[in-house]
Regions:
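Polybasic/polar functional segments that serve as interface/processing modules
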Residues: 1-112
Length: 112
């Protein structure tokens, strides 16, 4: 059923996504904007403007799957990335921290 794991490649779409979009529109964005192929088994992550809803698009055996998470409170804490990019590569561990709503660690700066 849930076939996401550490050996897959994960791509975060940097722009806010309208969460009314589903399989066809998200697949179109993967192809036309992100310049990736949804059929190759990679995982594509979309988040809404308010950072309260996430959709994960992935091809599994038998067809496309969308995992959909809506937070009851709080917001997803995304890593910082260059907004000029069409997609941001993230690691499995980072995705799990985002889904569990744990802020990715930042480098601590020492006071001078």
């Amino acid at each position: 059923m849930f076939h996401l794991h550490v050996n897959l490649k994960y791509f975060l779409y940097p722009a806010p996504m309208d969460m009314r979009k589903s399989f066809y529109t998200l697949s179109g964005i993967v192809t036309s904007v992100m310049k990736r192929d949804v059929q190759n088994g990679e995982v594509f992550i979309f988040v809404n403007r308010r950072l309260t809803i996430m959709k994960i698009l992935h091809l599994e055996h038998g067809g496309l799957v969308i995992y959909h998470k809506k937070l009851e409170s709080g917001v997803f804490k995304l890593p910082t990335f260059d907004e000029e990019l069409t997609s941001q590569v993230i690691q499995w561990h980072d995705l799990m921290m985002i889904v569990r709503n744990v802020k990715p660690k930042k480098r601590l700066l020492k006071k001078r």
